[in-house]
């Protein structure tokens, strides 16, 4: 069996064109473009690279971008004050708190300080709760990107058994909610799951998001399964692989996302889509 390649780069290009047009229409109506701000405490090479990629994405669709950098020694009160200032600024529509934070800072406290209407990472408890209840919410970008790929390739989820490997608030949990909303039967696996391979083999849809290179192999998959690989693992200088062993899994799956080039390129487009959604919502309330 030769698996269908779920091409994230192609979808990202399509989404970029759509968002760019919608952003231009928004600016024509309101007189301003959606504005995104990233709040970063200190930083490292990986964090700085990601911030630059967000800047390029914003510039590519005509959105405004700003970076607010705080010293590495910042305390919780300083961080939350910066977040609250951006939350209260009517010229800012989307806010990202760049993770990870230094050890003296609470990520939960920082996220809670956000205006949930500007929480374009979809991590605020209000957005998580609204998603769980099936209400309109800003959804975390990575799982939203995975769902967009399934939609792009018209993969039906109703009545299918979806196995999600990973239970983070960023990917695993929200992805399970999104799949459930599309009438899939969902199983979430994690580090304490007994007989992991047996559970994965039950999945018509398998999503891996644990940060362990090659954890899911072809032997674990039901023949014909659809595989979403959210893993990004650097195993050698310049070599990135996913949580799924591509060589074996691509021979068993009916469709699979590559790494790189699968879910990753769509993630930034979902961030832009959330920023546009937030700007539109705030404009309606003004």
From Swiss-Prot:
- Reactions this protein catalyses: (6R)-5,10-methylene-5,6,7,8-tetrahydrofolate + NADP(+) = (6R)-5,10-methenyltetrahydrofolate + NADPH; (6R)-5,10-methenyltetrahydrofolate + H2O = (6R)-10-formyltetrahydrofolate + H(+)
Could you tell me the EC number(s) of this protein?
1.5.1.5, 3.5.4.9
Q: In which pathway does it act?
A: One-carbon metabolism; tetrahydrofolate interconversion
Q: What one GO molecular function would you report for this record?
A: methylenetetrahydrofolate dehydrogenase (NADP+) activity
Please verify whether the record's keywords include Oxidoreductase. yes
Q: Where does NADP(+) bind?
A: 166-168, 191, 232
Question: What InterPro entries does its record include?
Answer: Aminoacid_DH-like_N_sf (IPR046346), NAD(P)-bd_dom_sf (IPR036291), THF_DH/CycHdrlase (IPR000672), THF_DH/CycHdrlase_cat_dom (IPR020630), THF_DH/CycHdrlase_NAD-bd_dom (IPR020631)
- GO CC, one annotated term: cytosol
The subunit structure is: Homodimer.
What role does it play? Catalyzes the oxidation of 5,10-methylenetetrahydrofolate to 5,10-methenyltetrahydrofolate and then the hydrolysis of 5,10-methenyltetrahydrofolate to 10-formyltetrahydrofolate.
Q: What HAMAP family is this protein classified in?
A: THF_DHG_CYH
The record's PANTHER family line, in alphabetical order, gives:
C-1-TETRAHYDROFOLATE SYNTHASE, CYTOPLASMIC, C-1-TETRAHYDROFOLATE SYNTHASE, CYTOPLASMIC-RELATED
* Protein name (database record): Bifunctional protein FolD
